[in-house]
Amino acid sequence: MTDMWDVRITDTSLRDGSHHKRHQFTKDEVGAIVAALDAAGVPVIEVTHGDGLGGSSFNYGFSKTPEQELIKLAAATAKEARIAFLMLPGVGTKDDIKEARDNGGSICRIATHCTEADVSIQHFGLARELGLETVGFLMMAHTIAPEKLAAQARIMADAGCQCVYVVDSAGALVLDGVADRVSALVAELGEDAQVGFHGHENLGLGVANSVAAVRAGAKQIDGSCRRFGAGAGNAPVEALIGVFDKIGVKTGIDFFDIADAAEDVVRPAMPAECLLDRNALIMGYSGVYSSFLKHAVRQAERYGVPASALLHRAGQRKLIGGQEDQLIDIALEIKRELDSGAAVTH
C-alpha cells in the first residue's frame, strides 16, 4: 500500500482521544472505530492509554479497559491498517513493548520531552530487535530552537528511530515555527530517518500547521477523527484528507469514507466535542501541555479557582508531561490569593 501515499497518516483517536475520554474506552467502541478507520483506508491507527503503555495510574488516570486488550482487539479487527502504540520511557517499560508486539502492535512510537531524547536509546534498540517499526516523538517542540530540536532528533535516529516527529504538544506553534523545525530535522536526518508532525488545535492551526509541515518535508502526519484528542484536540483527519486532496497530496484515505467514520462512528464514542474554548486557547497561547486540560479543570473545580488562570500559570512555569501533580500546588496558590482578596487574572 505504500505507493498510495505521499504522506502517511496516523489516526490517534484511540490514544490522544483517550485524554478527552478520561481513558474510558470500551472494547465495542475500539472495535467499531478501528473497523471504520480501516475501511476508509487509514494506514496506521494508534491505540494505547493517553499517556502511553503503562499510563493507567493514579497520576494519569486509570483505564476502563486494559490497553493491551485494546491493542489485541485492534490488531485482530484491522484488515489493512497497522496498529501503533505509544510509550514514554519511565512510564512504560520494555516488557510493555514486548507485550504490545505480541498482541499485534507493529509500530512502536517512543516519546520524550524534546530535550531528553537520550532516555529513549535503549527502547529504540529493543524495538528494532523485536522487528517493530520505530517512531520518535519530541514533545513540547515549541520550547526549543529548531537546531537544538534537530540535534535531539539525531540522537533518536542514531538509536534506531526510523521517523522523528516534531510534536506540538501544546498546540503553540504557528506555521513558520512548524516549517522551521521540520526543515531543520529534514536537513539533519537526510536519508537516515523520515520526519513527522503531530499537531493540536489549541490555536486553531492543526490542519494549517500540518500542511506547513508537509511542504517543509514531513512524510508522516498525525490527526484524530473529529479532533478527538487532548486540549482542543488534534488536526481532524477528515479535514486533513480534504485539504490534502485539494493540494494534490496522496494519502490513500477516501475523503467521504473518513468523513462518514468521523460523524457516524467516532463522534458517538466521544463524551463531548473537543472545543476551541477559552481554556484550550490559553493552553495554546501559554504553551501548556494539552493533556493538562482535564486535570486542570478537575483541580479548578475542587479548589474553586478559575481553570484558565491555573492553565496560564502552568504555562508560565513551563510544566511538562508528568508534572500534572503541580497543578494542585498552583490551584492552592490561586485559592490563597482569592481568599486574601487579591485579583487573579489570566
UniProtKB/Swiss-Prot annotation:
Belongs to the 4-hydroxy-2-oxovalerate aldolase family. Shows aldolase activity only when expressed and copurified with HsaG. This arrangement probably prevents the deleterious formation and release of toxic aldehydes in the absence of the partner dehydrogenase. The lineage of its organism: Bacteria, Bacillati, Actinomycetota, Actinomycetes, Mycobacteriales. Its cofactor is Mn(2+); Ni(2+); Co(2+). The gene is hsaF. SUPFAM superfamilies: Aldolase, post-HMGL domain-like. It comes from Mycobacterium tuberculosis (strain ATCC 25618 / H37Rv). InterPro entries: 2-IPM_HCS-like, 4OH_2_O-val_aldolase, Aldolase_TIM, DmpG_comm, DRE_TIM_HOA, PYR_CT. This is 4-hydroxy-2-oxohexanoate aldolase. It catalyses: (S)-4-hydroxy-2-oxohexanoate = propanal + pyruvate; (S)-4-hydroxy-2-oxopentanoate = acetaldehyde + pyruvate.
